[in-house]
Amino acid sequence: MPKLKTRKAAAKRYKRTGTSNFLRRHAFKGHLLMKKSNKQKRKLSQTICVSRSDIKSIKLMLPY
């Protein structure tokens, strides 16, 4: 059986936790930040868990 390939784009975006969840960063934090408040930018800097409906597809993209 051949080796499974990891989707490198997904590997850069998601990090697996110990309880088989995945962490991700918020969107809207890359550019156009002058119009956003400091509170909004601070909230967007935090990492959050991926929703349950997306975990199955991410596990297929990241087999290891």
Curated annotation (Swiss-Prot):
First-listed, main subcellular location of the protein, grouped into a coarse class: plastid
Pfam families, alphabetized: Ribosomal_L35p
Subcellular location: Plastid, Chloroplast
Any single GO CC term annotated in Swiss-Prot or TrEMBL for this entry: large ribosomal subunit
Keywords: Chloroplast, Plastid, Ribonucleoprotein, Ribosomal protein
Molecular function GO terms recorded: structural constituent of ribosome
One BP annotation, GO: translation
Keyword Plastid: yes
Keyword Transmembrane among record annotations: no
Record-stated family: Belongs to the bacterial ribosomal protein bL35 family.
NCBIfam families per UniProt: rpmI_bact
PANTHER family named among the record's database cross-references: 54S RIBOSOMAL PROTEIN BL35M, LARGE RIBOSOMAL SUBUNIT PROTEIN BL35M
Record-given protein name: Large ribosomal subunit protein bL35c
